[in-house]
């Protein structure tokens, strides 16, 4: 894929003696800690070993040419006039990054950029954050903007929030921008305090299973859940001096939950508060080398997302149910925003083939179409890639 984007840039925009540089940004999966990030809580993502490549070449004018090996659409943008255009589809993500960089006072000329990746779009594995981050890192490096990585992460989140209009938390951009091979990231969403936790998965594999249900984050119930959490917090604030739901302990919630008059809002808050504790318990389990305990917490997380947060649906539930029937599966849960997308499972290496065969067969029988299973590793965060021409 990396050489393909370099060759495509020359094919689409011609050869020249100007240097073509190559950058990469991974996808991510959140192992546990779902719908906690916009509630100020803990999340536990890791970068994956697949992602988005971008080949970039400077120009002298203010024109930016964008193309992708994954989509037919090619886009031309004038740096003096960047605005959201629904017709530009995927290109609005990198365009948003350029707009935010300009708003922050950074100057750069035009360029040609060609993207290509192997992250399934709409699966909840952060294809959007990956394309944002690879754009930000590429422009930062090529034009010597000297922006530190955490600020690049924040810029990319702002691009998705304000330019594209998706009210996402910061986890996706943080995971793809700050990922570290062989480690997951324990991230506190409101303060951005973080630490790397070694993922000692000897004898186990991470399997990501895509429901292949069509969905879009923009038109899902994501923003509705966010607003429900904010309403629940308003009630709890009457008795508790807290800034967000994640500051409420499970014990305090049990004591004060009746302040929330609406049962639905109470369930939403209960998920966030218990999920936050599950993340910390999961990190402890990993540090204790207790992969079985980690798996149990993943299952509890899924049950809470199904029963209290109500964001799973029959496709995700079927994948988890079928996975948990197999002996070699220690844990499985939905990951991402929900309503489709993917599950993440921890599976013994010698059970991977059985998982793929049995889960695919049973899901297809129950749902009517097949899922896609990815066996993945934990990869590096975004950065420049050396390449050799063919």
Swiss-Prot record:
The keyword Isomerase does not apply. Substrate binds at residues 34-37, 222. It catalyses: alpha-D-galactose + ATP = alpha-D-galactose 1-phosphate + ADP + H(+). GO terms for biological process: galactose metabolic process. Keywords: ATP-binding, Carbohydrate metabolism, Cytoplasm, Galactose metabolism, Kinase, Magnesium, Metal-binding, Nucleotide-binding, Transferase. ATP binds at residues 68, 122-128. The record marks 28 as: Transition state stabilizer. InterPro entries: Galactokinase, Galactokinase_bac, Galactokinase_CS, GalKase_N, GHMP_kinase_C_dom, GHMP_kinase_C_sf, GHMP_kinase_N_dom, GHMP_knse_ATP-bd_CS. Its EC number is 2.7.1.6. The active site is at residue 172. It is found in: Cytoplasm. This is Galactokinase. The keyword Metal-binding applies. It is an enzyme of class 2 (transferase). One of its GO terms (molecular function) is ATP binding. Catalyzes the transfer of the gamma-phosphate of ATP to D-galactose to form alpha-D-galactose-1-phosphate (Gal-1-P). Its main location: cytoplasm. Pfam families: GalKase_gal_bdg, GHMP_kinases_C, GHMP_kinases_N.
């Amino acid at each position: 894929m990396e050489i393909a984007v370099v060759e495509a840039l020359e094919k689409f925009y011609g050869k020249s003696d100007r240097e073509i540089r190559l950058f990469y940004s991974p996808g991510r999966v959140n192992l546990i800690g779902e719908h906690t990030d916009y509630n100020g809580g803990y999340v536990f993502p890791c970068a994956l070993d697949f992602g988005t490549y971008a080949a970039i070449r400077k120009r002298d004018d203010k024109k930016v040419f964008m193309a992708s090996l994954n989509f037919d659409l090619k886009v031309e943008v004038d740096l003096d006039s960047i605005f959201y255009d629904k017709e530009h589809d995927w290109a609005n993500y990198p365009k948003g990054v350029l707009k935010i960089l300009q708003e922050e006072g950074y100057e750069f000329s035009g360029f040609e950029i060609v993207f290509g990746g192997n992250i399934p779009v709409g699966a909840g594995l952060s294809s959007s954050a990956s394309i944002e981050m690879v754009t930000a890192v590429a422009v930062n490096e090529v034009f010597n903007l000297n922006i530190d990585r955490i600020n690049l992460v924040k810029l990319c989140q702002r691009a998705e929030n304000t330019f594209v209009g998706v009210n996402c938390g910061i986890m996706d951009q943080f995971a793809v921008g700050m990922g570290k091979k062989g480690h997951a990231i324990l991230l506190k969403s409101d303060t951005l305090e973080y630490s790397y936790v070694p993922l000692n998965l000897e004898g186990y594999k991470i399997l990501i299973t895509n429901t292949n249900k069509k969905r879009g984050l923009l038109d899902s119930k994501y923003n509705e859940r966010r607003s429900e959490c904010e309403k629940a917090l308003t009630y709890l604030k009457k008795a508790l001096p807290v800034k967000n739901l994640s500051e409420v302990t499970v014990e305090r919630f049990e004591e004060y939950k009746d302040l929330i008059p609406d049962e639905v809002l109470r369930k939403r808050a209960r998920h966030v508060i218990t999920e936050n504790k599950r993340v910390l318990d999961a990190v402890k389990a990993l540090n204790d080398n207790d992969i079985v305990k980690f798996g149990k917490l993943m299952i509890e997380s899924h049950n809470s997302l199904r029963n209290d947060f109500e964001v799973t649906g029959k496709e995700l539930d079927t994948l988890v149910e079928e996975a948990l029937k197999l002996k070699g599966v220690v844990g499985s849960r939905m990951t991402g925003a929900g309503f489709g997308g993917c599950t993440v499972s921890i599976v013994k290496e010698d059970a991977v083939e059985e998982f793929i065969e049995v889960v695919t067969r049973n899901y297809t029988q129950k749902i009517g179409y097949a899922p896609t299973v990815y066996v993945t590793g934990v990869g590096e965060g975004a950065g420049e890639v050396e390449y050799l021409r063919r």
